[in-house]
Amino acid sequence: MEPINAAIVGPGNIGTDLLAKLERVDSIAVQYVVGVVESDGLERARAKGISASAGGVDWLLEQDPLPEIVFEATSAKAHQLNAPRYHELNIQAVDLTPAHIGPMVCPPVNLTHHIDAPNVSMITCGGQATIPMVHAVSRVSAVPYAEIVASVASRGAGPGTRANIDEFTQTTGQAVSEVGGAARGRAIIILNPMEPPMIMRDTVYCMIDADADRDAISESVHRMVTEVQAYVPGYRLRADPQFDDPKDGWDGHGRVAIFLEVEGNGDYLPKYAGNLDIMTAAAARVGDSIARNRMGVPA
């Protein structure tokens, strides 16, 4: 069966790394790569025999055939303008910006729940790294509040990431609740200027029932790490989950802290850019499921 035609809009760090990952996905054939200025990403696409243009989405939507799936790695504001145009032409969009137009998807949590949606949000890099852990806890104990802190190498944060900091914190905090299963969520991002650059590190704090089964939570966390490692091999715990008994101000709840690190695969981006790598790996996994659904093939 022929693979589904796809396009990448935004040939920056994320878009170019995504292209490398999609080359390993049998259900997808990237036919177009689009930007608004000439770039290394466009040149790399052309070198692979892919139609690439700096003519933007206007150029893309004039092509024949049109792509069936678009992966957008531009900015939240750009995607808000482009998304209605894709929808009008029945092009499914996988949104790697924090625009959050469609339902939010995290592969090990709700990969197939929104497979027919015209637009799916990949949340943020911090969301893809930490929401699996919040979900791992919330499937064992009620989580009235969860907070995530994502620390990424400053050198690995391009202009798109920096321009979207506000959207990052808002969208990630919302997803910690809606997708992760916490009653309330909050997100913080830190751009770490250390040289040489450090790989992505994340801390997840979840309030839990005072009598929650700690062994069951730990087992759930370790099981979830294995699920994420199926598509992000560099995803790992830095230590076993750490538990705290209830303290003043915690309304009788205990707390679990989970410490993560994410090393990139090194496809296009350096290995320290695990924050970007987990986004592209998750998007490739979601795109594969969407493509197989369109083909009528089990994911």
Curated annotation (Swiss-Prot):
InterPro entries: Acetaldehyde_dehydrogenase, Acetylaldehyde_DH_C, NAD(P)-bd_dom_sf, Semialdehyde_DH_NAD-bd. The active site is at C125. GO terms for molecular function: acetaldehyde dehydrogenase (acetylating) activity; NAD binding. It holds the Pfam family AcetDehyd-dimer. Its EC number is 1.2.1.10. NAD(+) binds at G156, A157, G158, P159, G160, T161, R162, A163, N164, N275. It is an enzyme of class 1 (oxidoreductase). It catalyses: acetaldehyde + NAD(+) + CoA = acetyl-CoA + NADH + H(+). One of its GO terms (biological process) is catabolic process. Keywords: Aromatic hydrocarbons catabolism, NAD, Oxidoreductase, Plasmid. NCBIfam families: ac_ald_DH_ac (TIGR03215), PRK08300.1 (NF006157). Belongs to the acetaldehyde dehydrogenase family. This is Acetaldehyde dehydrogenase 6. It comes from Rhodococcus jostii (strain RHA1). The lineage of its organism: Bacteria, Bacillati, Actinomycetota, Actinomycetes, Mycobacteriales.
